Amino acid sequence: MKKIILVAGGTGGHFFPAVALGEELIKRGYEVHFITDLRCKQYIKQDMKVIFHILDLKRSGNIFLFLPRLSIAVLKAIKLLYNMKPSVTVGFGGYPVIAPMFAAIFLRVPIIIHEQNSYLGKVNKFFASFAKKIAISYAKIKNLPEFAKSKIVVTGGVVRENIRELKVIEMSSRGLTTGSKKSLIKALDSVVKPRNDKLFTIFIFGGSQGAKLFSELIPASIQILMQKQPSLELNIIQQAALDDQVKIKDIYSKLNITYAFAEFFDNMALQYKEADLVISRAGASTIEELTYIGLPAIFIPLPSAADNHQYYNAQLLEDEKTGWCLEQNNISAGKLADKILELISNPKILEDASQNLLKRRKEGHKLLSNLIEEVI
């Protein structure tokens, strides 16, 4: 049985798409090994069929500290790959892939890199000259070297199976018109039962680097929104830290808004299924999932994201009329409230955005697996 190594780490945005790819490759008869770092250890579940290996590489701004750490990690990776004898190594970008990719090059194992964002990251750009193929999610990608263009294959991103299994709901059947909200998520705590079946549901999540901001911004925006349109029937599903939930509950309760909170959503499919509109960061995996099911979003890109890639992701979607980009440095509760009200008041805008999203959807798990098989 041929062995394939996948390398991803740092955040769930890199981890979960790689797991989804691994599951597709296992179905095709390959033995899949996944090298990740300590930060992603928390995401590993017993029912995942890929074989995990933890190889941690701590970052440091001091080059004299980082190089010895990198050297040790590369030696460990060389030993690991030498014993495995893989047919190919696939890297998903970010500094956790550096050591395994160097090891693959040293052992002359073919490498493929996958860039999830609309801006080629530094690590992927470095390894582009060594890669057999470069899989990308966006046909229009920034920071791509001229020599790498011949290696490009547009595969789209890889979406988790439970998201792919979601039935795509037409936007015209959502929201304030005929959308039924009776099946409000039972898995979450702090749920207030819907008053009727015509609630407009907004799903808000920001990951570890967005939840705090959203816990302050969103309630303030909803207060303004309800002042402008008191007759709105809203349902809010929101990621929030426990410390913030009491304050937010008080605000939503006074506004007579249906709500549900969680610190972390284990099954995003459940929340997506309920939502009419998403407010989130603009990470690549989030965008791919929303694209796959045709669910429009207001994106607030993380300003500190490497190479400002989240801004480029969100701006590209806005240019394609598939989403809306509000920059964190320029946003206010009033601006966000106005945008939400505009979208709720004009269902056709949401419907058009949904259809535009579905037009750009790709079966990334299959296309990337096909590409890997071509290289082997």
Swiss-Prot record:
GO cellular component terms given for this protein: plasma membrane
Primary role: Cell wall formation. Catalyzes the transfer of a GlcNAc subunit on undecaprenyl-pyrophosphoryl-MurNAc-pentapeptide (lipid intermediate I) to form undecaprenyl-pyrophosphoryl-MurNAc-(pentapeptide)GlcNAc (lipid intermediate II).
One example of a Gene Ontology biological process annotation: carbohydrate metabolic process
Molecular function in Gene Ontology: UDP-N-acetyl-D-glucosamine:N-acetylmuramoyl-L-alanyl-D-glutamyl-meso-2,6-diaminopimelyl-D-alanyl-D-alanine-diphosphoundecaprenol 4-beta-N-acetylglucosaminlytransferase activity; undecaprenyldiphospho-muramoylpentapeptide beta-N-acetylglucosaminyltransferase activity
Record key words, sorted: Cell cycle, Cell division, Cell inner membrane, Cell membrane, Cell shape, Cell wall biogenesis/degradation, Glycosyltransferase, Membrane, Peptidoglycan synthesis, Transferase
Sites where the protein binds UDP-N-acetyl-alpha-D-glucosamine: T11, G12, G13, N117, R160, S208, Q310
UniProt topology in membrane: Peripheral membrane protein
Protein name per Swiss-Prot or TrEMBL: UDP-N-acetylglucosamine--N-acetylmuramyl-(pentapeptide) pyrophosphoryl-undecaprenol N-acetylglucosamine transferase
Family classification: Belongs to the glycosyltransferase 28 family. MurG subfamily.
Source species of the chain: Rickettsia conorii (strain ATCC VR-613 / Malish 7)
EC number assigned by the record: 2.4.1.227
Any matching Pfam family: Glyco_tran_28_C
Gene: murG
